[in-house]
Amino acid sequence: MNTTLSSLVNHQVRLASRPVGLPTADNWQFSEEPVAEPGEGAVLVKTLALSLDPAMRGWMNEGKSYIPSVDIGEVMRAGGVGVVIASRNPAFAVGDHVTGGPGVQEYFSVAGDQIKRSGLARIDLRLGTLTQWLNVLGMPGMTGYFGLMDVGQPQPGQTVVVSGAAGAVGQTVGQLARIKGCRVVGIAGGAAKCDWVVRELGFDACIDYKSGAVKDGLKEHCPKGVDVYFDNVGGDILDAVLARLARGARIVICGAISQYNNTGAMQGPKNYMSLLVNRARMQGMVVFDYADRYPQAIAELAGYLKDGRMKSREDVVEGGVAAFPEALNMLFTGRNFGKLVLKLADG
């Protein structure tokens, strides 16, 4: 065995119990294990950074979903970027930067027959930085791209509203809608986030939901109604937009972060009859359904980053896997500003 590899220790975070409400320290178990030499056809990767996403809260729950729950005792699922440190696969060389699903751990190995299924793929740092590969060029960007373009189907001149506008998915959706010739209205929490999406990202307007004036803001900024609503939050904000739909509107259901830590029943829409009155459509989307088209979206979005039509903002937390529990909860308390990333190592 490689003597350098044999000296490495893999620090991990495992799911110890299923949260009720906001995850606590009791829901996590810190563990470590030696790093093993990769087998025939396998690739060993050092994790450099992890993508922290609202969807992770749903993965901790039991029950039917679009992806199996994380098992108790299993390393917590997470996307990330890393660098290959050992390879017995001709498709990957030592030093290659890759994206994939490492989980919350410092090293991960992918068997040769699992590489495609795992999503392990080389990334080109000429197209974007490591953190941009977790943001606009990663799962959030793919979610925003296919959710808006395939489900929302925006047309030039239409009004697009996106909640969670300063977050990872929201910033991609809003900028892409602007590039496609739409009027863009964001909904975000706090004056600083609203100012940023208007001043830096080019949104036409942004409504601060913390001001309690979402309905009034929609009336002011969407006088002809909402043609496309990209929903990342659910709850009262979804209901407010439902009451302001234009005829033939499309609602993209991407997430409901306002509801993820409820200890009771999830709040459903009250104004759903607006769908009937306005001949509107509300459709859920899961980004993994579009995996075979990721290269198309990455090429387009990378072009926008290069020519300056699109910007990205990442909120990078340091501290390695030990910082994971606290960092994850930043998503659910509104403390992150931009795409939340947990840095594990330089590289």
Provide a role label for each language-model segment.
Residues D236-M310, K343-G347:
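Glycine-rich phosphate-binding loop and adjacent beta-alpha segment
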Residues T99, V161, I207, Y229-F230:
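N-terminal Rossmann-like NAD(P) cofactor-binding module of classical short-chain dehydrogenase/reductase
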Residues A213-P223:
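Short amphipathic alpha-helix with an adjacent loop that forms part of the alpha/beta core around
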Residues N2-L8, F288-G347:
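C-terminal hydrophobic helical "lid"/dimerization subdomain
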Residues L134-G212:
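Mid-domain Rossmann-like dinucleotide-binding core that forms the NAD(H)/NADP(H) cofactor-binding site
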Residues P34-L52, M60-V104:
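Glycine-rich beta-strand-centered segment in the early N-terminal region that forms part
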Residues M76-V83, A93-G164, M310:
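NAD(P)H dinucleotide-binding glycine-rich loop of Rossmann-like/cofactor-binding domains
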